[in-house]
Amino acid sequence: MEYRKLTKEEVAHLEQVGCAAEDWDRVMVHPNINIKYLRNVRFSGDCRIGKFEKAFTMPGGIHKHSGIYHATLHDTTVGDDCCIENIKNYIANYDIEHDTFIDNVDIILVDGPTSFGNGVEVSVLNETGGREVTIHNRLTAQEAYMQAMYRHRPVLTERLKGFAAEIVQQYTAERGRICHNSTIVDTGYIKNIYVGPCSEIEGAGKLKNGSLMSREDSPVHIGYGVIAEDFIVQDGSHIEDCTTITRVYVGQSCNLGHGYSASDSLFFCNCQEENGEACAIFAGPFTVTHHKSTLLIAGMFSFMNAGSGSNQSNHMYKLGPIHQGVMERGAKTASDSYILWPARIGAFSLVMGRHTANSDTSALPFSYLIEKNGETWLAPAVNLRSVGTIRDAQKWPKRDKRCREGRLDLVNFNLLSPYTIDKMMRGVEVLNQLRELSGATSDTYAYQSAKIKHSSLERGIELYRTAIIKFLGNSLISRLEKSRDLKPKHNDGEGDWLDLSGLIAPHSVVRQMMNDIEAGTIATHHEMDTRLREIHSNYYEYEWEWAYQLMLRFYKLREDQLTNDVLIRIIEDWKRAVVGLDKMLYNDARKEFSLSTKTGFGFDGNIRTAEADFEQVRGQFENNPFVTAVQNHIEVKTALGDKWIKELS
């Protein structure tokens, strides 16, 4: 855009209305500027000012015309139709794009060169260091997982640091940018901050060395009292209500609020953190905590809900806060739970009470960990029949608030996948071994510093087998709907599987990608990201390759024995498994409508009043949306199974 110098008449008028400049020749303006919208402005350095033709409509119906009033600008460019007023100190070294509104701010400056939060090292999991993740504007949960968890591959670690360094260099500058249609009001200190398009900063206390990666279709909001230093906030996220973050990465569509405090932590897409505290955590997608008394520390989580008063310890008062823990995807904690790290909690498990025995229950997913008389008791697989587990699995895709385009984190929502089914296979093996070693008549069994009741062990084996059969039937029918040729053309999906903080993939495929990164075959961050997205998009091909081999092993078949009669038997097993699990869920949901749950209803009446009050508030069991969904699921899956049995007969 071409700018012009101010005329002598314009300079004289500006000086009459309180404007001043170190050198008016260094103040360039839009050819069509109306200088009546400049009042009490001090210029220094090289400044460029756009035109003022539009007005902003504020809440309450008041209109403010674009212009610059009561401000000091140094080496700053202001785009068209901006309104900047009441800057107590100054704005320095910024390019402010069109249609931006800035009012009642203390100071906005860049003291460069700066990378706007890019390149900050976050000490996740181990407070004393050793698993640092370099944050940058394109960071994904999967890249961060590899940075943090693969320190046993130092060449890979160095390559990943190199990829990050390239991006950091791209974003390093001596000038800041406030992109178009942004709003900054009632804010204190802003230093070395990149402000993306349509950002909203209202009442923030202090923002230093960070990036707001806002987008037009997915704006960022920073609210009152927020203090943030050395950070990156991705699009769609809201940081509100006196939240304090230091050395923190906030992924897409996250909410941090109600005085939340976090340091040296990573929060990936759709996390919700309120009231509590986080230190050195790796919060994968959908990590949620809402309670003041909850501390998450030195742990890795994903698809997790922390109950009130949930705490962990990473310090044994010997060599410092050096311990860490993992709660695999879907694991959650009940109120007042406590875990002494190190520990590893199996996927989709529920932790209740205090646990100090450093257990590893990763081979027994979907379990309850219960404290009884100071000991950890394990109930394997019981979460498979919990209505809460299925409700969680259904709500996560619905609560993904990210825009369809430009999603960074790769998220697989499947509850039953090769990752969890392989763990169930190992779980059956573990439980059978315990039964053989201790005897089938033992009352209790010891595993990983935990105790398992005989009845819990037997029930766990049965539930795991039922879930495995359900998964195999799901995969078989999905394959039949695509092709009658069941034999996979490749074997990439065979072997064990990993969960890279949301991305579920075969270990062999991930390992090959890492080998290619180390060898330089994958030479840039973009190439790595492309490979990860290819792996994610090929999930169902990989899944069938794995499920096909498991089906042969589970049913003790050779490939030439996969006749239609055998497939019919597998589908019949699947029907029984689906209906059986759904009936368990149905019965579990019924407990929420028992007489005891009606306690406290019908305050001033009798039992009939309580029942009527309960129905008005909670509804009837038969009409509950989840209950009707379970009933419909039974009908739909039964019909689907019957259809394929008929076609194969």
Ranges and model annotations:
Residues K5-L6, A12-A21, V29-I68, T72, ...:
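Glycine-rich hexapeptide-repeat left-handed beta-helix
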Residues V105, K372-S649:
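Long, compositionally biased intrinsically disordered regions
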Residues M1-E2:
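Basic/polar N-terminal segments that are highly enriched at the extreme N-terminus
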